[in-house]
Amino acid sequence: MRIEEDLKLGFKDVLIRPKRSTLKSRSDVELERQFTFKHSGQTWSGVPIIAANMDTVGTFEMAQALAGFDILTAVHKHYTVEEWAAFINTASADVLKHVMVSTGTSDADFAKTAQILALNPALNFVCIDVANGYSEHFVQFVAKAREAWPTKTICAGNVVTGEMCEELILSGADIVKVGIGPGSVCTTRVKTGVGYPQLSAVIECADAAHGLGGMIVSDGGCTMPGDVAKAFGGGADFVMLGGMLAGHEESGGSVVEENGEKFMLFYGMSSESAMNRHVGGVAKYRAAEGKTVKLPLRGPVGNTARDILGGLRSACTYVGASRLKELTKRTTFIRVQEQENRIFNNL
């Protein structure tokens, strides 16, 4: 046993210090980025935000809507091959370039993903997702996927430390998914005592990944557009959003009505709700590590996407970054004990 004395920080612990700027308008900010990935060699350009691979967020409908904003969607792994085929038959090539195919790490997952990727060559992204990216089996699966799909861009996680980030990149991942426990419907930290404050995880993993020519996606912990800006400021190449994109018309959650008001169910993918739906219940040897919440219906996701992108542009103007790529170079974090004036928050 040992204790690390270094203070680790989450998004709520900091603000971004404003700096002199020559920008005259938020419209001067370029949010699109272009990446060439280490292993696949593929080049992609767009806004580096990803809708999470949750079945109440990462839907085909979400992919269609967010492609119009140049945003990626990690489509959840529970669609059948037939459902994928039907989607591909109706989706444009532009939509498909904004889609990630999500998978687990079983032999059945591998075979199913191979079938999906064979449906259309425009599917260039694979998202290999497990709750705990520290297992040897997971690393071996990433290497297997890289060998099988050498030209596909592979995103793999989740981890929160530099050495494991390096391990995954060396095993074939182009992008490492960073985050254990920060999600709005994740209870891993409560159930297990395991986790890592998200901003510190992003900063440390970005440093490790960039040293090897890899990239990271900050997954979880964003509750408002300012958190997205902080994640990019901390060095994230991509930011994945779940709760911020849940509860919309395109989100895919079940709708319930109470006292004349409609709500949409949103749950973590290790929650009892998710396991009841997809694997027949919670196995006797494990505990659920997610919760289910009811969100007021929020309308089309386009309104939320515009709000997030507007906040991100504004953050860039406050530090003089004319491009999103420059934000991390111009970011100075200050530690704080408050984020906002909350006097009217309950009204």
From Swiss-Prot:
Catalyzes the irreversible NADPH-dependent deamination of GMP to IMP. It functions in the conversion of nucleobase, nucleoside and nucleotide derivatives of G to A nucleotides, and in maintaining the intracellular balance of A and G nucleotides. Its EC number is 1.7.1.7. GO terms for biological process: purine nucleotide metabolic process. Homotetramer. Belongs to the IMPDH/GMPR family. GuaC type 1 subfamily. The lineage of its organism: Bacteria, Pseudomonadati, Pseudomonadota, Gammaproteobacteria, Enterobacterales. GO terms for molecular function: GMP reductase activity; metal ion binding. Keywords: Metal-binding, NADP, Oxidoreductase, Potassium. This is GMP reductase. The active site is at 186 (thioimidate intermediate). GO terms for cellular component: cytosol; GMP reductase complex. It comes from Salmonella arizonae (strain ATCC BAA-731 / CDC346-86 / RSK2980). Transmembrane segments: none annotated. Pfam families: IMPDH (PF00478). It catalyses: IMP + NH4(+) + NADP(+) = GMP + NADPH + 2 H(+).
